Amino acid sequence: MGPRRLPWARPGPALGLLLLALAGAVPAAGGSCSLLEEGNTIQKLHEDCFCYVQNRTMHLQYIWSTVQVKINSTRTFRFVPTPEKSNCRNSETVFEFAACAVQILWRPETSTETFLKIKQYGEDFCFRIQPFKEELYTVSMTREMLDGKLLFLFAAGIFLFHFANSLSRSTNFFYLSGIILGVLALLVFVLLALKRFIPRRSTFWILLSGCWMSSLYLIYCFKENMQWLWSEHRIYVLGYFVAVGTLSFATCYQHGPLTSELSITLFTWTLQLTAFVFIYCGVNIPQVAYAIIAVKPSPKGLGYPPAAAWHIGRKMKNHFQSKKVVVRCLTEEEYREQGETETVRALEELRSFCKNPDFSSWLAVSKLQSPHRFAGFVLGSPHVSPAETKAHDEEYGIGSSFLEEQLFETRTESEQDETTSYIHEGDDENEDEIHEPISFPYATELL
């Protein structure tokens, strides 16, 4: 078996390196460093330093992208972050200082393969590779345009903040949160379970702060060595998850869900703060994360993303969906107007076609009964003669025989309907008279 990555770093050199890095007293070894660029691969035999210069221009297409540096070799090498390029001395917040200290202290001293994810739009990142022997090692940098982890964290943060009030009142989510807290932060879970046995509140808050710091450190250690632990000690990891998860569920079930409004409110605020952490960790550009976190607490800001998504979805649906043809019946007036318009348009098209030089006029004239009338139509005369117009008015106009026949038929049908209804009413009355019982007023006297 070849050399593998050592899971734990030796505390002596790492602690010394941490102290020097925090003090900023270690100068850069050597002269210029090799610059890392996206998509490039560098192969070296001897000790060398490498730097990644951050791009100061922000691009929104990189909001969920990550830059990953991979260092691999057939033999072990030492990975040393360049102290003056580290962020510890110039940390702006306590969280950045603690993260930098943990990163320098926890980084394994020797390994055969190392993966680094560089935070973009921050400080320039430099490190040094020290091989124990002259063996070829490779340093490559790649960019993943859409990191699924970042997108999942961002979506989870938005969902958790938006439904924090509803989730804090859910019994199932309470048990699920207890299991997750017990697995990831066992010390915090145990302290919360034993809260009733701690008399002073100040002591409880001091212990809670220490447990949270220890839990965050253990979470970071597990994250950095998760691949190695899963490949080498999978059974122990699964056993820990099952045992601690079951114990956490039993403790939450014994305690019962939250009932007081104060506890539910505190749980809601905790979920919202966790959502802010997810949003910040799920966005690669800090300025964008700050803007989203600033907009989310406002009541009006809660309605903007759903409204914008609904508006964009409606526009896309109208754009891609084929328009349905609406069919309706024409009124009598619309039918007459449309008929006159289409007739005039068709006659003009016929005149234009007959005036075309390609039209075989002699062949058409030979088949017509009145060529003189056809020539007049082509030159602009009406297609109907005055005699034909008069005959049409007499046949279908006001006072025509056709209209009289229509009116007579309508009147006859209405009279027949009235007669039929009268006959039915008479029959009903006769039936009522037949079925009506006959009374004998003198029946008593006859008896």
Swiss-Prot record:
It is a multi-pass membrane protein. Keywords: Membrane, Nucleus, Signal, Transmembrane, Transmembrane helix. Belongs to the NEMP family. Residues 410-438 are annotated as: Disordered. It holds the Pfam family NEMP. The keyword Heme does not apply. The chain crosses the membrane at residues 144-164, 173-193, 202-222, 235-255, 275-295. This is Nuclear envelope integral membrane protein 2. It is found in: Nucleus inner membrane. One of its GO terms (cellular component) is nuclear inner membrane. InterPro entries: NEMP_fam. Residues 1-28 form the signal peptide.
